[in-house]
């Protein structure tokens, strides 16, 4: 008899939980979704640094667009040192992801994996208290650093034909504290 009562209690608990979840979902459908708005790209362009000595920089690019029901802001700048296929290059991009917190959570959670092989490495890093992820492909000499700033800005630095240690020099050129205050 005790076991039957226990089964009924469990069924009641599961049923109550299901009804509660369904009621919450129905109630939530009637609530407006409050999504913070992304900043205008013009506020982020000044964060992109000038070219270091002996380098040239392309004109910064940026946009704020409506994409599938939410807005997205992105800025980007390319840097070159010399000419030709083997010349060192760098690119810096900033994406305002405040309108998509699920994307932020999923992406930064994936940064917890570290690996090293004969082909390169990937590792989680912390830059001035900001979580990040660094990857390097030896054969192509392609290095990338992603940093999440203020839980909203994805900062990406890509280097081609450079030592991956140069990522640390490039990140110093970006004012992360100033970026964190832009809203």
Where are these regions (language model features)?
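Bacterial N-terminal signal peptides that target proteins for export
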Residues: 2-14
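Sec/Tat signal peptide C-region and signal peptidase I cleavage site
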Residues: 24-28
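A short, solvent-exposed beta-edge/loop patch
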Residues: 29-34, 81, 115-183
């Amino acid at each position: 008899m005790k076991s039957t009562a226990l089964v009924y209690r469990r069924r009641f608990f599961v049923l109550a939980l299901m009804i509660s979840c369904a009621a919450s979902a129905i109630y939530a459908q009637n609530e407006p979704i409050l999504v913070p708005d992304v900043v205008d790209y013009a506020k982020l362009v000044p964060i992109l640094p000038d070219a270091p000595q002996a380098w040239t920089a392309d004109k910064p690019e940026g946009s704020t667009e409506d994409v599938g029901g939410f807005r997205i802001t992105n800025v980007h700048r390319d840097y070159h040192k010399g000419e030709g296929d083997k010349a060192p290059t760098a690119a810096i991009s900033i994406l305002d992801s405040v309108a998509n917190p699920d994307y932020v959570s999923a992406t930064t959670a994936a940064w917890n994996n570290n690996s090293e092989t004969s082909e390169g490495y990937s590792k989680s890093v912390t830059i001035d208290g900001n979580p990040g992820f660094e990857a390097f492909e030896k054969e192509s000499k392609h290095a990338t650093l992603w940093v999440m700033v203020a839980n909203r800005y994805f900062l990406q630095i890509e280097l081609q034909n450079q030592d991956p240690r140069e990522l640390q020099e490039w990140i110093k050129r970006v004012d992360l504290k100033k970026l964190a205050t832009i809203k």
